Amino acid sequence: MEVIIKAKVKPTEDKYKVKKAILNIFPKAKLTFIEKDNEFGEWEGKTKSVEKLKELLRSQSILDAARMVLEKGMTENATKFYLNKQAAYVGAVNFDIDTHGGIFVKILADENEDIMKIIKDIAPRTKGGVIINEDELEEEEEKEDSEEIKEGHKEENNLKIKVIDNSSGD
């Protein structure tokens, strides 16, 4: 897995505060400042660690919201989203709709990785605020579905018998 991070620095912003915002979420990121002609500049970087992001999502109890955002931004082998700079500056995760001012994050799966598995690791589903094992949940749901189908067949068979009984009584 590789995480690509980009954040534009507007003329009204302190470039080192923007850098701090990124490092508060991705402390192991290697960042480079790139001067731009029409803008003040942009921080670009990469990391392989999402541990701090995972920790913040759990401590802020926003795993389900994070999961929704990660799934919404998912492509074949990646997911992308924006983080609010001001929130990141104070060490908090807040997903940003503003694509022009936020911190752009793209998480790329390696060839032998599944992006959905990475998303499940970063933001597992919860029930009542408690992380649930999705694999067990999926097995349970499949079992329940199978039982419902069996019950449905029984009802269909009973219905057929009733129809036959009613027609023979004439």
UniProtKB/Swiss-Prot annotation:
Protein known as: UPF0201 protein MJ1564
Residue spans of biased composition, Basic and acidic residues class: 149-163
Organism field: Methanocaldococcus jannaschii (strain ATCC 43067 / DSM 2661 / JAL-1 / JCM 10045 / NBRC 100440)
Stored Pfam families: RNA_binding
Family named by the database record: Belongs to the UPF0201 family.
Disulfide bonds: none
Composition-biased stretches (Acidic residues): 133-148
UniProt xrefs under PANTHER family: UPF0201 PROTEIN TK1335
Residues annotated as signal peptide: none
Spans annotated as Disordered: 133-170
